[in-house]
Amino acid sequence: MDAINLKEKEVFKKEDRGFANLVEEEYLQINQVCLEPSQQVLRHNVNPNVTLTVVYGEGTFHIGDEVTRMGSGKLLRVPFQSPMSIKNELNQRLAFLVMKAPQLNEIQVETKA
């Protein structure tokens, strides 16, 4: 069993987003992103399946043409290849997890011959 202390893994930077890779496996990647007030993750297209959850704080999540403000206690599913940006518009720190997994059809299943 491996317990990861999210507080110990926090990385905050004055000039850019903080980033910590928590899990790096063949079919799963989990990163923690930390934003100071007014910082953001610039718009980009997500290439794997992505699920986001806020650890603490509240962020504004732009996914495609939709915008939602979200705090802790929810999961936000981001469709494959969607444009996404995230902003911390409040006067408090924001920490969230980014969970990435490949498309199911990209996973090759080994069969016994």
Positions of PLM-derived features:
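Ligand-binding loop in jelly-roll beta-barrel domains
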Residues: F80-N105
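Glycine- and acidic-residue-biased ligand/ion/polar-headgroup-sensing regions
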Residues: P48-G59, G64
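A short, N-terminal "cap"/entry segment at the start of jelly-roll beta-barrel domains
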Residues: M1-Y27, L76, T111-A113
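Structural motif
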Residues: E58-T60, V67, P83, R93
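Conserved short histidine dyad/triad with adjacent acidic residue
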Residues: D16, N31-V46
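Short acidic-glycine-tyrosine-enriched beta hairpin
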Residues: D65-F80
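Short beta-strand His + acidic residue motifs that chelate non-heme Fe in jelly-roll/DSBH
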Residues: V41-R43, F61-H62, V78, M84-L90
